[in-house]
Amino acid sequence: MSSVTTPAPVYTWTADEAIKFLKEWNFSLGIILLFITIILQFGYTSRSMFVYVIKMIILWLMWPLTIILTIFNCVYALNNVYLGFSIVFTIVAIIMWIVYFVNSIRLFIRTGSWWSFNPETNNLMCIDMKGRMYVRPIIEDYHTLTVTIIRGHLYMQGIKLGTGYSLSDLPAYVTVAKVSHLLTYKRGFLDRIGDTSGFAVYVKSKVGNYRLPSTQKGSGMDTALLRNNI
């Protein structure tokens, strides 16, 4: 005796159920979206490093979430057209995710800094202050970089890096590391304001995949690799 397989019922959302769902979760979704909007709007290194790190975590999580959703769409595609688009989107998302990791690893090899895995930019500005290398992300490689000392506090492009420095500690060169090459900026102007404050302007002078001589005698350290970073 053959048994007849009963097809599983197909569940569909009605308009009333969708409205009910939005009413129940509207407040929570609004709070979440407001939080994400504030983080994305005000998450800058020159304002708050803590908020900026949270912003980077949110941006970083976008990739795996996108890949998961596109794979889910492939498994539960409504029809062949949706399936085709879902497969294309999945392939594109995975390729871009792989490219991101490859570029980040290449930049990490060059700088040794975990900022290399920043999903927002592949530009890392680097300054050697008395043997201590500071590495921070910037959006683009500017033609000039400004380093400011305010009562011993060190700022570069408005980003606070450290304390206990004077204008005499500023190096002759700073660099911006990219995935494929290194940009060198030469100090072109320095102005002292009072006894403990002032600023220096660095101008882009050289671009290439090369190594700068170490500022630490006998260390064998290459400043282009920037291993001693914080």
UniProtKB/Swiss-Prot annotation:
Record carries keyword Transmembrane: yes
Intravirion-side positions: 46-55, 106-228
Transmembrane helix in keyword set: yes
Topology relative to the membrane: Multi-pass membrane protein
Bridged cysteine pairs (disulfide): none
Subcellular location: Virion membrane; Host Golgi apparatus membrane
GO CC annotation terms, alphabetical: host cell Golgi membrane; membrane; viral envelope; virion membrane
Coiled coil (residue ranges): none
Keywords assigned by UniProt, alphabetized: Glycoprotein, Host Golgi apparatus, Host membrane, Host-virus interaction, Membrane, Transmembrane, Transmembrane helix, Viral envelope protein, Viral immunoevasion, Viral matrix protein, Virion
Transmembrane regions listed in the UniProt entry: 25-45, 56-76, 85-105
Side of membrane Virion surface, spans: 1-24, 77-84
Molecular function terms, GO-annotated: structural constituent of virion
InterPro entries the UniProt entry points to: M_CoV, M_HCoV-like
PROSITE patterns the UniProt entry points to: COV_M
Subunit annotation: Homomultimer. Interacts with envelope E protein in the budding compartment of the host cell, which is located between endoplasmic reticulum and the Golgi complex. Forms a complex with HE and S proteins. Interacts with nucleocapsid N protein. This interaction probably participates in RNA packaging into the virus.
Protein role: Component of the viral envelope that plays a central role in virus morphogenesis and assembly via its interactions with other viral proteins.
Family classification: Belongs to the betacoronaviruses M protein family.
Protein name per its UniProtKB record: Membrane protein
UniProt source species: Bovine coronavirus (strain LY-138) (BCoV)
Organism lineage: Viruses, Riboviria, Orthornavirae, Pisuviricota, Pisoniviricetes
